[in-house]
C-alpha cells in the first residue's frame, strides 16, 4: 500500500538504482551508474486518493527497488520510515482516526505474494506463494473497504 494514488494508474518505472549520495542507508535513482531496474505497477484500489493498494511486478530485483520506484512517482510505501520525506506523510481525504492508524502502521505495507526464480544448480523454475498477512488485511479493511474504495 502506498500514500496517494499513482498517476497514471498503471505504468512502468525504469531507472538505474544505486546507493544514495546523501544517505548511505538509502538507495536512489541515478542518471549515471547504478543497476538497471524495471518495475511494472497497477493501482488496484484507492481510498479517496489518500492511500492505494498497488500491485508491482519486477523485471529486476534490486535492493529497495519497489521503495525507490514508488517514491520516485510520489507514492511512498505506508510505514516506510526510511523513505518518508519528513516524518509522517501528509494524508488528505481520510478521517483523523484513520490517518492516525495509517501513520502508526508499524512496518512497511509491503508483501511479496509470489516469488519465483531459476534454481542455480538444477535449472528448474521454482515459485513460492503466500497468503496476505492479517495486519495488511486490517490496514486494507480500515482504509479501503470502510471508506468506500474506488477501483483505480
Locate each region found by the language model:
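RNA pseudouridine synthases
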Residues: 1-152
Amino acid at each position: 500500500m502506498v500514500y496517494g494514488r499513482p498517476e497514471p494508474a498503471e505504468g512502468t518505472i525504469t531507472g538505474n538504482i544505486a546507493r544514495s549520495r546523501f544517505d548511505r542507508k538509502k538507495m536512489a535513482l541515478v542518471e549515471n551508474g547504478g543497476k538497471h531496474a524495471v518495475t511494472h505497477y497497477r493501482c488496484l484500489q484507492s481510498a479517496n486518493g489518500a492511500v492505494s493498494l498497488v500491485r508491482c511486478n519486477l523485471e529486476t530485483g534490486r535492493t529497495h527497488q519497489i521503495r525507490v520506484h514508488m517514491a520516485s512517482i510520489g507514492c511512498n510505501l505506508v510505514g516506510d520510515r526510511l523513505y518518508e520525506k519528513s516524518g509522517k506523510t501528509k494524508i488528505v481525504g481520510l478521517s483523523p482516526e484513520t490517518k492516525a492508524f495509517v501513520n502508526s502502521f508499524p512496518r512497511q505495507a509491503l508483501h511479496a505474494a509470489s516469488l519465483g526464480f531459476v534454481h542455480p544448480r538444477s535449472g528448474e523454475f521454482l515459485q513460492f506463494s503466500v497468503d496476505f498477512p492479517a495486519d495488511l488485511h486490517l490496514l486494507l479493511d480500515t482504509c479501503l473497504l470502510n471508506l468506500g474504495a474506488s477501483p483505480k
